């Protein structure tokens, strides 16, 4: 990997939940460890490294959690993005806001029978989490959640994403983390003096869209036991291993800078 990156500017893009932070019982409890935060900040300080976070969370939420190390951010799987002097808000978001609000009310009413169900209203997307529900009830709750949105799914107003013990509804547009990675790279390239290689870290099926969008000059790192794809160059066990990887990458970039 170091040979592949030796003469290139590194654009480090990473998912949040399950990659930077351990999966938690609720989204609010998923916090960045101080060790990972420190290593990420160390990398961001290098002139030849740019850091971005690409997440299914709302943009403001994930940027608040990662802090100033992330120069670029993509929320809602890339439907909203921001960087220095640039921002992106997909046109489809505003068209589904009222639909999501109505489905959130319907789901809260219809799924109240199931203990442990958590509905996460992201304004432009709605996620049903069943991590805290009894397994035999959680699967049924997810089926009912999907059924509530069937008219919008059939009309292609919304699409359904499958997560870890969760289902998510969001605008049915051809936009994903792969598009987000391309958008960010296109804005980094004019700002640096050498070719750009993306190092992308992700743990979920939605990250496969980014893996597919990357080229031979890029590095794909899977985190945890998912996703299962031949596109992965290396695999790390979890967020603690991600922190150690950041430390090794920083050591390499520091050594390369001293040699020049």
Language-model regions: role of each:
Residues 7, 180-260:
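Mg2+-dependent phosphoryl-transfer enzymes with acidic/Ser/Thr/Gly-rich catalytic loops
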Residues 19, 59, 206:
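Conserved Rossmann-like nucleotide-cofactor binding loop
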Residues 106, 120-200, 205-214, 218:
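Conserved acidic, metal-coordinating active-site core of Asp-based
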Residues 7-9, 48, 70, 123, ...:
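A general structural motif
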Residues 31-122:
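Active-site phosphate-binding/coordination module
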Residues 1-16, 20-24, 35, 186-190, ...:
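Non-catalytic pre-domain segments flanking phosphatase-related domains
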């Amino acid at each position: 990997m170091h040979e592949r990156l030796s003469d290139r500017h590194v654009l480090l893009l990473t998912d949040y939940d399950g990659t930077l932070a351990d999966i938690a019982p609720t989204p609010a409890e998923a916090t960045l460890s101080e060790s990972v935060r420190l290593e990420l900040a160390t990398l961001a300080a290098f002139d030849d490294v740019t850091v971005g976070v690409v997440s299914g969370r709302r943009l403001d939420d994930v940027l608040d959690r990662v802090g100033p190390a992330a120069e670029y951010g993509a929320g809602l799987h890339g439907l909203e993005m921001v960087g220095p002097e640039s921002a992106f808000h997909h046109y489809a978001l505003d068209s589904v806001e009222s639909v999501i609000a109505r489905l959130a009310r319907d789901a809260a009413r219809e799924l109240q029978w199931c203990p442990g169900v958590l509905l996460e209203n992201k304004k432009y997307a709605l996620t049903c989490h069943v991590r805290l529900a009894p397994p035999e009830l959680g699967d049924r709750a997810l089926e009912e959640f999907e059924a509530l949105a069937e008219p919008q799914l059939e009309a292609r107003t919304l699409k359904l994403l499958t997560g870890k013990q969760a289902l998510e509804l969001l605008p049915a547009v051809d936009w994903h983390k792969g598009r987000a990675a391309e958008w960010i790279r296109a804005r980094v390239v004019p700002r640096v003096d050498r070719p750009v290689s993306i190092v992308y870290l992700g743990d979920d099926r939605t990250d496969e869209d980014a893996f597919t969008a990357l080229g031979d000059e890029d590095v794909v790192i899977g985190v945890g036991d998912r996703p299962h794809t031949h596109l992965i160059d290396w695999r790390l066990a979890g967020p603690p291993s991600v922190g150690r990887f950041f430390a090794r990458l920083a050591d390499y970039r520091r050594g390369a800078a001293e040699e020049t």
